[in-house]
Amino acid sequence: MRLKTDEKELLKRITYNPAIFGGKPIIRGHRIAVEHIIGMLAAGSSFEDLLEGYPFLEKADIQACLVYVHRLVAHEKIEPLLVKDNKTHYRRKK
């Protein structure tokens, strides 16, 4: 399954930094792990609950988490962006 353009744009919101949460995927610019957002959704929180609890997030950030996890489950190879020292580093596909 190929990524749609809007999904590609959403995935740009998911980054990782080895210095934050051991390199787990996070929402770009925030110390919020994708797994935290997915866990809260799985526990019954709504988008509105998350946006109220984390007012710095945007709806697209939550959607990006869902797209990211969907791609993992679908066994798609995705490459999150490495952000280190406030610089973006792209991983090379093997």
Which residues fall in each region the model found?
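Long, charge-rich, low-complexity alpha-helical segments
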Residues: A33-K94
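N-terminal first-folded block
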Residues: M1-R31
